[in-house]
Curated annotation (Swiss-Prot):
Substrate binds at residues 92, 108-110, 258-260. This is Oxygen-dependent coproporphyrinogen-III oxidase. Homodimer. Residues 240-275 are annotated as: Important for dimerization. It comes from the Bacteria. It comes from Escherichia coli (strain SE11). It holds the Pfam family Coprogen_oxidas. PANTHER family: COPROPORPHYRINOGEN III OXIDASE, MITOCHONDRIAL, OXYGEN-DEPENDENT COPROPORPHYRINOGEN-III OXIDASE, MITOCHONDRIAL. The gene is hemF. SUPFAM superfamilies: Coproporphyrinogen III oxidase.
Length: 299
């Protein structure tokens, strides 16, 4: 079947609506929408929930950009894209909760297609979701990864393990020699066996995110915490900023190609702190995190 960009766009718009409704149902606060246009073609809907009952900040962004030619930074790695018009669309979100016992979460699903007359289109899907806890709870990690594994199963026995490994490899801070969190799923360049199969998998990942995340939020959101836990959360959020600005391909691509800066940086935590040569107290719950986020088989 020929790739149907319109069908993908409708799914993504509906996914943004659904996720925002689900997060509002948990939090009570509403999202504020900011629609924007891109000079070169396309635009998007950025939605942000700030200072809610549960979430300090949640950003859910839809974008659909198109143009007559790919930027040079993109065609350098993929010469087959030169001379083609393109469309890129996706939903990307990050949720930063108030409570340090509730993990930060990130999800993204996207579709890209490049066409020129007389040639087959070049297209692929990408996406995934990952979890960044500040305090480790095994039952939460198992639930997160079990949900990821279960949504992958209809698409093949090895799909979960392959995309879990890709996620572990991708969300890694080389300069710290540590994982960003406990991972989840990450996939890119997905275009086989056919459009329908790949689109169905992208939909499963998009819908699976809230199944994986919201039960954890409900379990942890009322746990009592104090200044110590909050300070540790803000310190660990620094790793999130470091990863996004130093290693994340999507952030770098967006900033280098004249993307909308406000939407690209919507993933940043609203408050964060760094402390020179900080080491948590030995034997403390804070010290246990470094072991908890090491790569392992959760299910």
């Amino acid at each position: 079947m020929k790739p149907d960009a319109h069908q993908v766009k409708q799914f993504l718009l509906n996914l943004q609506d659904t996720i925002c409704q689900q997060l509002t149902a948990v939090d009570g606060a509403e999202f504020v929408e900011d629609s924007w246009q891109r000079e070169g073609g396309g635009g998007g809907r950025s939605r942000v929930l700030r200072n809610g009952g549960v979430f300090e900040q949640a950003g859910v962004n839809f974008s659909h950009v198109h143009g007559e030619a790919m930027p040079a930074s993109a065609t350098a790695h993929r010469p087959e894209l030169a001379g083609r018009s393109f469309e890129a669309m996706g939903v990307s979100l990050v949720v930063h909760p108030h409570n340090p016992y509730v993990p930060t979460s990130h999800a993204n699903v996207r579709f890209f297609i490049a066409e020129k007359p007389g040639a087959e289109p070049v297209w692929w899907f990408g996406g995934g979701f990952d979890l960044t806890p500040f305090y480790g709870f095994e039952e939460d990690a198992i639930h997160w990864h079990r949900t990821a594994r279960d949504l992958c199963l209809p698409f093949g026995e090895d799909v979960y393990l392959r995309y879990k490994k890709w996620c572990d490899d991708y969300f890694y801070l080389k300069h710290r020699n540590e994982q960003r969190g406990i991972g989840g799923l990450f996939f890119d360049d997905l275009n086989t066996p056919d459009f329908d199969h790949c689109f169905a998998f992208m939909q499963a990942v998009g819908k699976g995110y809230t199944d994986a995340y919201l039960p954890i939020v409900e379990r942890r959101k009322a746990m009592a915490y104090g200044e110590r836990e909050r300070n540790f959360q803000l310190y660990r959020r620094g790793r999130y900023v470091e990863f996004n600005l130093v290693w994340d391909r999507g952030t770098l691509f967006g900033l280098q190609t004249g993307g909308r800066t406000e939407s690209i940086l919507m993933s940043m935590p609203p408050l964060v702190r760094w402390e020179y040569d900080y080491h948590p107290e030995a034997g403390s719950p804070e010290a246990a995190l470094s072991e908890f986020i090491k790569v392992r088989d959760w299910v």
